[in-house]
Amino acid sequence: MTNYDVIEAYAEDFTKWAYRNSRGTVKITNNTIVITNVVETNNIIEDDKEPYSDLTIRVTGVTENKYLIVRQGRGKPEAYIKKDGVYTFKDNNLYFGFGVSVIGECNITITQLPTSILKDFSGNKHDAYLYGFKGKLNSGVGIYAQDFKNWSYGSTINNDISTKSYNKFHIVKKKADNWFGFTIGIPKNNYYNQSYKLKFNINKKIDDINFSIVSTDGNLITTAAYSVYINDGSIIDVPIISEEIFNNKEETNIYYDLGTNKDIEIDVELIADYPNQLCYDGKSYAVAYGLPILTDYTVIADRTWFAEKVDNGVFMSKALEQNGAFILEYKQGDKWNTYSYYSATNINIDKDNSIVYQTKNKYNEQTIYPGDKQDTDTLFIGTIRKDDSRSFNGCHGDILIFNRTLTEYELSWVKNNMMCSKQQEPDIDL
């Protein structure tokens, strides 16, 4: 999974579909269709222009007697949706659209689900749909200290050949014998002053060259903030720039300065913290629909909280209204709770261990007390539920959910053999 994959995106824009208002009444947004009245059972809204995308939708408000009709042209059979749930339609064509089986008032909602997903590798097809991820900085795969797309090349760099992405520059000079000098930079108000790692690749064998980070007005006033010698394959730790230098108001920009005039091309790559983990910025979350209703469970996750950024937040949950098998880790100020069948227990968080598990009666080794509420079929990651401000700021790797309480041996085995980022340790053999 890449940062491109997690950016919230949709296959279709419903506002561009043909609305046949003589056939019924529909409220339309980019991603939702709400049918409130039916005059005739033909398509009330349909796609009459190419391309005809594969589409995954969530439908609510249907019954056995008042159901959604999905129909299209070119000989494809109609589909009838009589149960709320998630449905996928592939290889669609002209006039793909929606009608209702019964004339009169109704309240059927068709919600297009994003193409950005967190894949379920269990084979159960319970993919989680990703909302609000930006694919950069602290909202996507790994955490990146800077967004290189916002940086600008200096006057000696060939903009037509050089390239940049959110995490990498490929730098080529205009003239072979030019000094690189102020190679690439950004205004201080867009520079995130924190520590990070850079990796350098150089296309020719050369002696070590000096790499500096400077605070500058871009002309005459310059202060060196950091300097180190680099070569092909070098990885460096860029420190936080001192407040005295960073707050100098005359020097409004930060630049990378490469002290060489060699005829070379240089790649500068920003190395992510928490690589291969999905990172949440408090505004992003994931939702999986149609999960089994659990009467017992074990959930195991490899997660890291950035707890200092969260006052009131939840890692993951199956809560809808006052039901749900678990709310795993609910932070309220300095207090931590966890919920089992909607009964709360105060817990202690082990901040040095990213692997956490919860069963019906235990959070890690701590006893918790389950309530008597029912489970739901929806899983939320990064929030307690959709459209709720109690969110997660942090990262996670593997998440595993079982439909029973695992034994100590099974828990140990799962941590060692199924949690990809967990260092091996002896299985507990009882």
Predicted regions, residues:
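Glycan-recognition/cleft segments
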Residues: 312-339
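Extracellular/lumenal carbohydrate-interaction signature centered on repeated Trp-anchored short motifs
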Residues: 44-55, 184-196, 289-300, 347-352, ...
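Extracytoplasmic low-complexity segments
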Residues: 1-32, 106-178, 186-191, 195-227, ...
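Extracellular beta-strand ligand-recognition surfaces/modules
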Residues: 88-107, 237-262, 360, 375-386
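Carbohydrate-binding surfaces in secreted/extracellular proteins
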Residues: 348-373
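Solvent-exposed strand-to-loop "edge" motifs in beta-rich extracellular domains
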Residues: 58-63, 199-205, 302-309, 317, ...
